[in-house]
């Protein structure tokens, strides 16, 4: 169909059918139930996106609006934004520096795609952002793999993408200058860390949005970390446990 379909709903449907297929082949009951819960979650996302996306597109058509707006539904439906479009919408982070807190590589079997995911923090206000580099298997020889970074990044403007309430926005870092971080930067980051109760409250708010990312990053203020068998236990100064 070329450009005559919306890639966002298609990807959700692919993941839904993939999880159903995996659940049917699973022998362990616990794994089967986990896969089925995941399939239901994808179906819930698909239903929500169809309902909200249809209303959004109808409104845009009636208004004869052809240019992308700052609604994250545009991205969820599969819209692709250029850096210049983000800047034109005023979606830029200015006069700040960023440091990476964590880095991971995920693989989505349903999409047959790797995701290099960097979690960054603004040294100005402690806001968390995500750098996302998508690498489909079909284009693995043409898209460079990202790596972790221990440098402070600075730019005149960092463009970022619209996000659902409470969700860490995706940010673009290609025009940034890398610098050696200072001790004061790490002290500032520690000052932004939240106690467990506050972080859980913020994460719960982010996860209320069906179309938002399933995982909510948080910078925790901890006093103890313990590992027992396959579980990690966290405690903060107030005695809260996670």
Where are the language model's segments positioned?
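Helix-loop junction hotspots and adjacent acidic micro-motifs that serve as functional foci
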Residues: 1-242
